[in-house]
Amino acid sequence: MTKAAQMAQTTAKGSVHLLWGLILSTVISAVGTIFIAKLLGDENYGLYTIAVNAPVLFATFRDWGINTAITRYVAQYNSQNQLEKIKSTILSGLIFELTLGIILTIISFTLSGFLANLFGRPLITPLIQISSIVILTGALISTATAAFTGLEKMHLNSIMLIVQAAVKTGLIIALVLLGFGTAGAVWGYITAALIAGLTGILLTYTMYKSLPKTPNSKLEILSTTKIMLKYGAPISVGAILYGFLGQFYSYLMNIYVTGQTGDAAIGNYSVALNFVVLITFFATPVLTMMLPAFSKLDAQKDQQTLKNVFQYSVKYASLIVVPVTAIVMTLAQPAIITIFQTDYSQAPLFLALLSISYLFTAFGSLSVSNLINGQGYTKFNIKVAILTAVIGFPLSFILISNYGVVGLIITSIVVSLPGLFISLIFIKKQFSVSVEWLSSAKILFSSAVASVLTYLLILLLALPAPLELAIGVVVFVFVFTIMSVLTRTLNKADITNVRDIVNALGPLRKPLNIIIDIVEKLVELVH
């Protein structure tokens, strides 16, 4: 087995461990979201959404790229068996995150009135004061996640996610039913985040203590922090620019999307965002696990492996994420109606538009930044962020002022493309690596055909929404599979690679191999 195939196995195993955590936590959260949205109504749900997101402006300054640095260096040191450096990296990152988390939480609490006025809703000042704690809890959760990812212990991350989802759902529903309204929802959200953060740190500690002790070694907190800041600061500068851009979007929304109609639109937007997790189920594990994978490789010594790993990541991620995205876009309306009936009537349109950016997986959007950061070229992030900001500020003003939430979504789609394209040019020049464009085109074409046929069939049948949803999923999967075989998107080499990857997935190996056998027979018929 090649080195690329071995890395693919490890990455797939970590992705599956993260996937089950995402699925369970999201199902729990989705059930909670349905009840919470119904209990609060679209206006109060919109206020709840604003309150818990308001401190993001200050949270942007907490990380300074430290969490990305933790993942990168822990993965690198683990592959080099430098265990003491792993300990120094995790502990240094935690100290840095906690220190800034506490400081920024206090600042956010103090300036909560300013934030409330900035969002055009001064009455939610107490809610923003409560939600300011999310900055500190975010430090705990993100540090634990970075450590789990670097050591590829994603089952621990899944435990943390499930704890957060279960506590959040139970607490918010209970507090709202007890009559605490929007304030109860915010308290439930923050309490769950705190419990999840403490759980994550406890699991990180057990993982930390399990690392073998190295004789005559000591922790080097200050020097390690300097190394991580040198690596992570450019990422943070980019993140801060993105943060200001996001807050500018929010500011425009508060000016042009106002009143009861505006709050309802924000509520619809929030519901649509919750449905997008159907796509992130599959996109997030790939996005998360590729940074440690690329961090283990040396572009000079492992050039061919680097190329293979990148192309595998793009192609196989696209084979999953692109069709799932197409399903969500095609069946957005019956999906929303099935759960909310006639409520949240704008959500299907918002959901379909929000899904578009995940189609860029076929262009390498989930892998390219991880390749660049994994190889240490973090300063490139600043160039991408500046380009995005230069386009985003004027474009958002034009689109949001005229089209509200739709303008916001279109802006977020458009501004991401230039950065993606210059990133692809960079990796081509720097590493001689590129996307396998023909495969990506075939995947997009197969998904488009399946979407069109599924949509037309549902339009003709005009059945109740739950039946349309069920039939639509079955028809789409069938058509996409046939089209993938006919267009030769999958070949025998791909089948072999996928089978090797699947064989590392334990209990999932047998059912997945049955599916692979069926696809293999279809491929043999065409070839």
Language-model regions: role of each:
Residues M1-M7, T11, G200-G246, A293-N308, ...:
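Interhelical loop/hinge segments that connect adjacent transmembrane helices in multipass membrane
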Residues M1-S29, L83-E84, S88-S92, K218-G238, ...:
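N-terminal membrane topogenesis motif
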Residues T10-R72, G101, T105-F109, Q129, ...:
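Signature of the first transmembrane helix
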Residues G14-S29, Q164, G188-A196, G200, ...:
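Transmembrane helical elements of multi-pass membrane transporters/channels
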Residues W64-S79, G150, K209-K213, A272-V321, ...:
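Helix-loop junctions and terminal segments of transmembrane helices
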Residues S112-S131, Q260-D263, V328-F360:
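Interfacial segments at transmembrane-helix termini and the short loops linking adjacent helices
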Residues Q129, I159-Y208, Y231, I386-I391, ...:
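Hydrophobic alpha-helical transmembrane segments
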Residues T388, L438-N497, L505, D517, ...:
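Transmembrane alpha-helical segments of multi-pass transport proteins
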